[in-house]
UniProtKB/Swiss-Prot annotation:
HAMAP family: UPF0154. It is found in: Cell membrane. This is UPF0154 protein MMOB4450. The lineage of its organism: Bacteria, Bacillati, Mycoplasmatota, Mycoplasmoidales, Metamycoplasmataceae. The keyword NADP does not apply. InterPro entries: UPF0154. It is a single-pass membrane protein. It comes from the Bacteria. The chain crosses the membrane at residues 7-27. Its main location: membrane.
Length: 75
């Protein structure tokens, strides 16, 4: 009976620790991902327009589409 209890305890605890590890890993990964998005937001067309205006150039739609296309191809 003692052997069965020990085996059951080992199996039960290993399952419990696996579940706890998965939950903790999920929340840590989510927090890290959200932090990365806050620090490095994805660039959009509005940001490219602002960049062109800061450089003193009038942004045309073709320039903006070209920059967006080159950004997608660079990934």
């Amino acid at each position: 009976m003692e052997i069965g209890l020990a085996i059951g305890l080992i199996v039960g605890l290993s399952i419990l620790f696996t579940i706890v590890g998965l939950v903790v890993g999920f929340f840590l990964t989510k927090r890290y991902f959200e932090k990365q998005l806050r620090e490095n937001p994805p660039i959009n067309e509005k940001m490219i327009r602002a960049m062109f205006l800061q450089m003193g150039r009038k942004p045309s739609e073709s320039h903006i589409k070209s920059v967006m296309r080159s950004m997608k191809n660079a990934k």
